[in-house]
Amino acid sequence: MEFKVPQPMTQRPIYTLPENPTIRQLRETAVKAMRDMLTIQWSTGKEIRYNKKGAVSGKNYYHDPGQLYCGLPYADGQTNLYVWLEHYNMETGEMTFDGDGVWLNDHLGNTCAGSLMWGWSAVCRSLTGVFINYNMVKKYGVLPVGDYKYNTDITTYYDHKTRDICDENGQEKMFECYAQIQLGDGITSTTTLHTMMSIIDAVVVRDENGKIDGEQSYITLQDQAAGKGKEFRTEEHDGLIYNYSGKINFHAPFNWLWEKAYIPITTAELQGLIPYEKAWVNFAGAGITVEQLIGGVFQSNYPMCLIKTFATDAQGNKTLLHKRYFNRGDVGTGRARAYRIISDDQEAFQAAVAKLPSGEYTLSAEVTVATGEIFTPVSFSYSK
């Protein structure tokens, strides 16, 4: 059988929703946002190298010219799809970079938890982070699915593991919590050091006494995972070959979830506890001088993915002055919702402005948020 291959992404996905979306629409959109990161087809004209840290320490990943890849690479930078698309040719699907070979750890690619967080962030504004640990529950906008017990006083990662939670609640209780998983919910385990998202509502099979059958009951998952050097796993789904390390259609029986000590997690928006809100970006500052642009605050209710500032001359020629990417860590610190050029990029920005020829310009900023929308919260005339 001859399989089709994924096609290049021909336009930027935008995850806007109507004024009063249903919870189901939120969930479906979160699944799609994460899946777009896992299934984008790409190639490279030069070797791209990654060196892994953390859970996959010491492994080097190589992406070779002429090879078709699918999905963002596993990388510690943990940035959104829109950062990747900054280097992506939508006509050919090829990534382009400066240099002979590129070490991309700094900003391109994602981890399992980062992928889940950015998928959720397309519709959820309550998150401040997603981590592969137990103590994130009710701490970063992450909530439990079901009523399993956990200790909210635990603040250190190794003090309380998901295996302990499963054992303390018991298999029957955890099965009942797994049974409440809906598409868009996540699972996390400190045993496997992994986080995934369900793409279906749990399929639950009970015996004649109402007890859940752990082998027949299951969820189906998607995830961002790490490859092994030049060996990339291949998966067929819907007639497509996905030549990368993540999974997009992984069958997980409840018995397996229990064995691997997964606990189910979700967000307030996906549970209908707080309302959906349209994305907005504003600029807190006068924004009529370069100094005010540098010192002002870009604010958003959703995580920002990147900010670009431009100088546009009278002929409409646009010069990029500076670019700032935001990663999962920036979401956790709050910088992805409140950012000042003066805090990180003042010197580079001022150097770029100094290089502009004399003339009349419009200085402006474009902000991309996790919904995919692009806002221009500040624009003003500038004479040099």
Model-based region annotation:
Residues 127-228:
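...with weaker cross-activation on analogous glycine-rich loops/strands in unrelated enzymes
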Residues 299-324:
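Extended low-complexity, serine/threonine- and proline-enriched intrinsically disordered segments
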Residues 319-342:
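Solvent-exposed serine/threonine-rich low-complexity stretches and specific carbohydrate-binding patches
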Residues 372-384:
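Short beta-strand elements
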Residues 200-273:
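Active-site signature of cysteine proteases
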Residues 2-125:
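N-terminal capping segments
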Residues 352-359:
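Surface-exposed, short loops/turns at beta-strand junctions within beta-sandwich domains
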Residues 261-293:
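Short, compositionally biased P/S/T/A/G/V-rich stretches that sit at domain boundaries
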